[in-house]
Amino acid sequence: MEVQRNFFIFAFLFVSFLLWQAWQSQMFLNKKTNEKIDPIFHFIDVKKNKKKIFIKNDVISLVVNMYGGDVEEASLLAYKDTLYSSRPFKLLETGSDFIYQAQSGLIGKDGPDSSINDSRPLYSANKNFFVLGPNEKELRVPIKWLSKNGVIYKKTFILKPNRYDVQIEYDVYNPSKESLNMNIFGQIKQTINLPKKRNVYSGNFALQTFRGAAYSSDDNKYEKYKFDMIANNKNLHIMTESGWIAMLQQYFAVAWIPDNLGKNTIYTSSLDHDTAVIGYKSPIINIPPNSRSIIKSKLWIGPEIQKEMKLVAPNLDLTVDYGWLWFLSQPLFKLLTILYSIIGNWGFSIILITFIMRGLTYPLTKAQYISMAKMRALQPKIQEIKEKFSKDKQRISQEMILLYKKEKINPLGGFLPIFIQMPIFLSLYYMLIGSVELRHAPFLLWIHDLSSQDPYYVLPVIMGLTMFFIQKISSTNHISDPLQKKIMNFMPVIFTAFFLWFPSGLVLYYIISNLVTIIQQKFILSNLEKNR
């Protein structure tokens, strides 16, 4: 039956799309131009120092190095490191084989973090551990440094309950008789090559989730920038009044959001082609003699939760990257979250959304089966035309077109549902691997994570059996070409192998979709038989 041919076409189109997607992504990201980087943007390092403080609210735990006051480690307390781990997920860390840090400071002519100084400021604090209490609305963690000329620098970390954004506030008191000129900077640095322990699942085949740098500016709401570009010194140098800079990975992001002090500079840099840096630098900030100035910026360290990121900075929620099918993935995700709020199980929500999608496309499915039934009825006439004009292929085409017009049949009518189902399928895939809400989301029995593959491959096998059943009730006896018939008979095996490494939530969607296909096929074809 033509439906088997359609399955094969679907597979071909899907694989072709994966290859095109990988090529398109590479071409798009390589369009950046090499920029000359000012020496002030060069890598700012921190001395190895055992003096650290620990800051914690109910969702994040931070480790701050007192040299410069950089965030060297950050753990997300609401997210496990792995599915069966009791440890919280560590987003930022400083180790022997991997570095991922959020740095900030004051640079420029009079900035204590300027590269012209021998070292960065060594701050002090009145204690080592700071924890937000159960009934507290805000945790303020001040660290201080006194310069040789008497300037007092106070850097304060401000955390609020159940929030992943951290306010960084510099309070600079200038008691001297001269003005001070400096710039605030914020940058994120990360080792480009992941160690084995962090190199975990991030997608399948060509549809990998993005890991790299990103930024938002006056001209671009959201732009990704590959680590490879930074490693090869093809760096950014962008002036903008709005925006942010970030480093992204599957489900999580670290971002600096500067205060609007005028034209900020967004830049990238690298160290020995092994460490990538993206950052921003503010315009010059003047602090008059005998005066105080407050300078602020904001740091996001956490999961890519769209509704929360929207509140922190414009366009920060765009880091939840659903690819070019975002216009389908976004409403699908919103619908899925509504269903989850009612049902309380992501797996059953996926099942219900499958019924909704198949219900919406039912008119097209019905038209597909009617078109295929008419095509089957025309097979004797088509065969007669082929035999009659076997030596004239052009005449065969002309006669078949006339036959289709006479019988009022569109030979491509059976393909429309496939072109509808393919983007739905892909958008659901992007949603599953890009939405942190589905990370480690359980279903039933052995399925403990709908965003990763079935550990025992049970769902892919069930999916293959549903395809085999569809093939049996459809029958391939009408296919005259022996090679094509063998391909059709082998399709369930091909698809089963194809789906082994797909997220179990996606395989669940396809199983339910196949079951709906079986029901709809039996119903529509039985009605067609009755109406003959």
Swiss-Prot record:
Q: Which gene encodes it?
A: yidC
Which species is this record about?
Answer: Buchnera aphidicola subsp. Acyrthosiphon pisum (strain Tuc7)
Gene Ontology MF term list = membrane insertase activity
Q: Where is the signal peptide?
A: none
Keyword vocabulary terms for this entry: Cell membrane, Chaperone, Membrane, Protein transport, Transmembrane, Transmembrane helix, Transport
Q: Quaternary structure per UniProt? A: Interacts with the Sec translocase complex via SecD. Specifically interacts with transmembrane segments of nascent integral membrane proteins during membrane integration.
- What is the protein's known function? Required for the insertion and/or proper folding and/or complex formation of integral membrane proteins into the membrane. Involved in integration of membrane proteins that insert both dependently and independently of the Sec translocase complex, as well as at least some lipoproteins. Aids folding of multispanning membrane proteins.
Please give the name of this protein: Membrane protein insertase YidC
Could you say which protein family the record assigns here?
Belongs to the OXA1/ALB3/YidC family. Type 1 subfamily.
